Structures are given as C-alpha cells and as structure tokens.
Amino acid sequence: DDLAQQLWLDPIELRLKNVLKTGMKNTQGAIPAGAVRADEILRKAQKHSLWVNRARRKKEYEASHPGRAYGIGFACVQKDFGTGAESSFAKVEISPEGRIMLRHTGTEIGTGMSTSQAIACVRSLGSPATDLGFAITDWPDLPMKTSGDPYLMSQSDQDGAQVDPQWTPALASPASASNSAFYYTHTTREACRVIFQYGLWPAALALWGSGTGGGQAAPYVVRQEDARWEHGLLTANGMQGLSLAQLAAKAHEMGGVVGAVVHGFNRWQWAEAEFPIGNTTARLAADGLALCFGEGAAGSAAAQAKSYRAIKRAHVYYPPVQRNNAGVTYYSAMGSLAELAINLANGEVELLNHHSIIECGNVLSEELVSGQIQGGIAMGIGHALYEYLPLYEDGPGNGTWNFNRYHLPRASEVA
C-alpha cells in the first residue's frame, strides 16, 4: 500500500497489475488448475462501497469522533490446498428402496465433511446419502496395498510397483483443514458416477422403453448427456421423471451396478485407470474399483449378488513423481476489507465492519462455506489484534507458555 501511494496508484489496482492470472506458472513452474479468479476478487473489492467511499467515510467519521483515527484496510491471498499425495476410499451403495449408504476414510474434525460428502451424492444420484459412516480404516471390498514414499520414490520405483493392480502410492490421507471439499468429494462422486452410469441409467432406459413399440422413449433420442435430476426425479429429453426408488428397484432387478468402492490418488492431478465393466472398458479418475451388482446378476459370471468384486485395472496412469517438484496446482483466493477506528490516546483498535469475498469453487453447502469464512475471520482478528508473542528466549517456544500467558480471543472480541 505504501508503494502504491508513492506510485499514485489505487492499492488494489497495483495488486491487479501483479496478480497471478489463469495460465500463468507459479514460482516453481506449475500451471494452476482451471480458472484462477483472484483478479475477479480484487475487482469486486475495488467496487465495494467500503472501498469506493473510504475517503469520504474517513472525513465524516473523524469529524464526528475526535481523538480517533479511521481507515480501511484490504488484503487478498491465494492459498493452495492439498499435499501432493492425497488419497481416500469411498463406498456408495443403493438399496432396492432407494436409500443411499456412504462409507469413507475421511474423518469429521469440524470441517463439515460428514455433511458435504452426503450432499456430494446428489449430483449423480439425485438425493443425499442418509446412512453414513466415516473414519473407516478396513476396506475388505477393495484390498489395496502401498509401499515406498509417495514424495521421495523414484519414477522407476513407481513404474515397477504400479504393475501390481492392487498397489497405490498412498492409501488414505489424514483429515486436515478443508480438504474434504475437493479431495474427499472426488472419490465419493466417482463412486456415484459409476452407479449412475452402469446401474441407474440402464434402469431408466428400461423403464422409459417399456411398453408397446418401445414405450415413451421410442419417438425421441434419449442420451445420457441429456440426463438431469429435477425435484428429485430423473429425466432426459422430455422423458417422464423417475424417482430414485423406482430406478433402484429396477437396477437391482436387472443386475446393474448398485454399489461401488473407489480409491483415488492425487499428486496435483488425479491418477486414472482403465477398468473392464461388463462389455466395456471405462477410464476413471481412480486407481481402484470394486462393484456390487443387483440380485438379477446372481447367476451370471459378472458378479455375485450382495457381494463386491474388485475390478482388476487394465492400465493405470499415475502422475509422474516429478509433479511434486513443480509445486501446487490447486488454489483458492480470498479478499477482505476491514473498517477500523483507532483511539489515538491509548491505541485501542475497534473493528467497525468487514467484508470478505472468497472463490470456493462449486458450493456444496452455503452454511458450511459461511462457517469457514466466519471462522477464518475470527482467527484473523485474534491473531492481528490480540496475539502477542515476544521474540527470543522469553517467547512461546521456551516451554512455559500456556493460556495463562497467551490471550485467547473471546467471542465478544472477534464477533
């Protein structure tokens, strides 16, 4: 901000001239994933009334509050998420009545992952999961093994190990920060996608095509890319809406896929593998897959009813081990405006107002996103205004510090 003042530039305008944009490389050479929208956040903040009217508001406030200084602060950060060896298991299963069961290696530590993963099923299955289980460590339906260090192994070691169809660079990531919103959701949604494509969609075609002359589907061209859920009913190109209960019952009757266990691995890009499913080969963004087929498949060679069969991958495509050397690829940006007043007599700082803008990707739960923002703001206020950690030998690293010496911000101070 001081530099912007010397250049006679709006401080946000100076940031816009230096912001990382879509397609640019980071400092280590990696190109961030997708659209990098930090510049959009800067422009939104630049147009906010707190920023636009800051000079007028300062003049008015200081005129009516003698002895107090007024100011507007702004900051924008881009934070990466992920470790370069993210992995998880997810199991999704649909009962003949249409109830969705979800099991996951992820652990709920206050991030809301138990809610987000249930909601993640809606995209493919039309309803959230209601039978939930997390922090699962035993996965007999999809036995996988690991060896070596996913960060330090050589490319030749990975190439040799991946010949084993049960091998993966890492089994399951610990829960941390907000990794559930992206990494955990990936395996959940991949499992749901497989169930939809090889279970619910064939069931829908069978129901729409029943009746004389091919039923209601015959006069139309019905493609999977036209499928969508509306008010809990599946439709496509004008077809009658079908409930999940109808589709599940039919999928079980036909012997379609009604359950899937998926394992995924991410080294700044997702591992992919080819799996034989029925008479087709599917390339999935996963390195492990097990399927459960409906009762109609009990007598077939394709599956055993009520049990899972691990599908041996034909080919696997792991990100090169050198991918970690290029740094991270997943970023999220957040900008905050803060309206402050300072008592010139005693230095007391009062936060009058604040406004934050975040680019969080596809929202799973607005309430959870809001909660994450509020928690981050409370932490930031606490660190900036109430945290005092002296340097050197008397600092908090000497082993004598606890909450008797560290000021723990109270709700009244950060709300």
Where are these regions (language model features)?
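C-terminal catalytic domains of large/alpha subunits in multi-subunit enzymes
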Residues: D1-R68, A75, K79, A120-A415
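Short, aliphatic-rich beta-strand segments
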Residues: R99-H104, L351-N353
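Conserved beta-alpha junction segments in alpha/beta enzyme cores
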Residues: G71-P96, H104, Y330
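Glycine-rich NAD(P) Rossmann-fold beta1-alpha1 loop
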Residues: T107
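Short, hydrophobic/aliphatic alpha-helical segments
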Residues: V92-M101, G361-L364, I373
